[in-house]
């Protein structure tokens, strides 16, 4: 049974960093194409990166050098430093090739970046 598990939400302040996680079960993350996308409320999906251990990690041009991708055991991560309000979005991990027709998706983490104290 293939499952991609993501935390439901996170709240951060501008200038902070955050590491988003995606823990998988039922397959080896290093043997498949793993992807991250974001969706700003009211907008479409935006591809961020694709990874496979035997290939390079490919980043969207707009975020190349800004976010960092890593893996540890059965979990993939993206770390976003110096967060901005415009980073507020739903972030999804997914397995497969041919964006956006990927076969397996995480449920997404909604990241809120706000200066308002929660």
Swiss-Prot record:
Expressed mainly in lymphoid tissues including spleen, epigonal organ and circulating lymphocytes. The keyword Protein biosynthesis does not apply. GO terms for cellular component: extracellular region; immunoglobulin complex. Keywords: Adaptive immunity, Disulfide bond, Immunity, Immunoglobulin. It comes from the Eukaryota. Disulfide bonds join 22-93. Residues 1-109 form the Ig-like domain. The keyword Disulfide bond applies. InterPro entries: Ig-like_dom, Ig-like_dom_sf, Ig-like_fold, Ig_sub, Ig_V-set, IgHV. It holds the Pfam family V-set. One of its GO terms (biological process) is adaptive immune response. PANTHER family: IMMUNOGLOBULIN HEAVY CHAIN. This is IgW heavy chain V region W26. The lineage of its organism: Eukaryota, Metazoa, Chordata, Craniata, Vertebrata.
């Amino acid at each position: 049974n293939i499952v991609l598990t993501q935390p439901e939400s996170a709240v951060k302040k501008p200038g902070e960093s955050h590491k988003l996680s995606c823990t998988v079960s039922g397959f080896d993350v290093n043997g498949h194409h793993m992807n991250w996308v974001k969706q700003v409320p009211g907008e479409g999906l935006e591809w961020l990166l694709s990874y496979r251990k035997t290939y390079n990690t490919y980043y969207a041009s707009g975020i190349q050098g800004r976010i960092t991708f890593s893996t540890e055991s059965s979990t993939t991560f993206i770390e976003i430093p110096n967060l901005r309000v415009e980073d507020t979005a739903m972030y999804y991990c997914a397995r497969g090739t041919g964006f956006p027709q990927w076969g397996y998706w995480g449920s997404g983490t909604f990241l809120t970046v706000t200066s308002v104290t929660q």
